[in-house]
């Protein structure tokens, strides 16, 4: 069996390369760096009076130091002339320090007044700018409201016009219909009136004819009755005269009655025929 070769240095070097290639192929999730938020520390707000006092103290110390330096230089020069090198410091007097403080206070008050004036001017300018902005906004709102009102008024006017037009059209249509209906009714009424007039005329003519026929019939009947009565009287007279001819007289009476009845039937038929003629015309 062949022995395996021990892993040399070359093999040891190749392994990490392979691992690095594999790792490079892998996607590494990128985590964004989270920066710690700065916490706002509570700072003491210095008042104007504190600031004024600090400025006055620092300025007084600076003036006192300059005066001390000037005194030291003079003494040094005098001692140098005399061959001595002693340095003597002249203490600053309290009066000078107080004067310097007062001067610094006056300067600070003047500066503070100027600052106050500047701040007040800035505040006024800001207020004026705000007022102007508000006025501009109000003007824009007013213009927008006016435009909306104008648009609404125009729309309402259009609706009114359309409504009026529709109402006028409806009225015209209704009037036209009524006129047409009235005309039709009038024409129908005229036709009906004419028909009624014709019927009345026909009735009147028929009534007149009937009256005339009735009168004629009455006259005829009266004439017949008179004739019958006269004949009866004559017969009675003849009976009285002739006594024996009663049978003949009775026969004659029967014949006369039959003739009269036949005539009456003929007249009734003629009257019925006359009445039927105007009805057929209607």
From Swiss-Prot:
Modified residues (Phosphotyrosine): 76
Gene Ontology biological-process annotations: chromatin organization; negative regulation of apoptotic process; positive regulation of cell population proliferation; positive regulation of DNA-templated transcription; positive regulation of gene expression; regulation of DNA-templated transcription
Residues bearing PTM Phosphothreonine: 31
Intracellular or extracellular location(s): Nucleus
One GO CC term on file: nucleoplasm
Per UniProt, location of the Glycyl lysine isopeptide (Lys-Gly) (interchain with G-Cter in SUMO1) cross-link in this chain: 101
Tissues and organs where the protein is expressed, per its UniProt entry: Ubiquitously expressed.
Compositional bias (Acidic residues): 125-138, 257-270
InterPro entries found in the cross-reference section: HMGN5, HMGN_fam
Keyword ATP-binding: no
Compositional bias segments (type: Basic residues): 37-46
Chain spans, region Disordered: 1-282
Statement: the UniProt record of this protein carries the keyword Nucleotide-binding: no
Biased amino acid composition, Basic and acidic residues: 81-119, 139-152, 158-256, 271-282
Positions where Phosphoserine occurs in the chain: 93
Entries under Pfam families matching the protein: HMG14_17 (PF01101)
Main function: Preferentially binds to euchromatin and modulates cellular transcription by counteracting linker histone-mediated chromatin compaction.
Family indicated by similarity: Belongs to the HMGN family.
Protein name (record): High mobility group nucleosome-binding domain-containing protein 5
Species the sequence originates in: Homo sapiens
Recorded name of the encoding gene: HMGN5
